Curated annotation (Swiss-Prot):
The lineage of its organism: Archaea, Nanobdellota, Candidatus Nanoarchaeia, Nanoarchaeales, Nanoarchaeaceae. It comes from the Archaea. PANTHER family: 60S RIBOSOMAL PROTEIN L23A. This is Large ribosomal subunit protein uL23. GO terms for cellular component: ribonucleoprotein complex; ribosome. One of its GO terms (biological process) is translation. Binds to 23S rRNA. One of the proteins that surrounds the polypeptide exit tunnel on the outside of the ribosome. It holds the Pfam family Ribosomal_L23. HAMAP family: Ribosomal_uL23_A. Part of the 50S ribosomal subunit. Contacts protein L29. Keywords: Ribonucleoprotein, Ribosomal protein, RNA-binding, rRNA-binding. The keyword rRNA processing does not apply. Belongs to the universal ribosomal protein uL23 family.
Length: 78
């Protein structure tokens, strides 16, 4: 998993407690949610899409406030 650090991704992080990551195409929403819940984070919602370049992007929204920033720091961003 790779954290995206675009303007939109940072805005989502700050305003909506959501991280934006690139994941392997075979990952499902439930697999992504399970990954973060095993680490002890409560996930509210996962949305995925395939980009024009064929990459899979996931938006992961967390239930608890401020968790997205902590997760982003763990994934090597910010």
């Amino acid at each position: 998993m790779m954290l995206l650090q675009t303007e939109k991704a940072l805005r989502l992080l700050e305003q909506y407690n959501t991280i934006t990551i690139l994941v392997p195409r075979e990952y499902t929403k439930s697999k992504i949610k399970e990954f973060f819940e095993k680490k002890g984070y409560k996930v509210k919602k996962v949305n995925t899409l395939i980009t024009k370049k064929g990459l899979k992007k996931a938006y992961v929204r967390f239930k608890e406030e401020g968790v997205a920033r902590k997760v982003a720091e763990e994934l090597g961003g910010l």
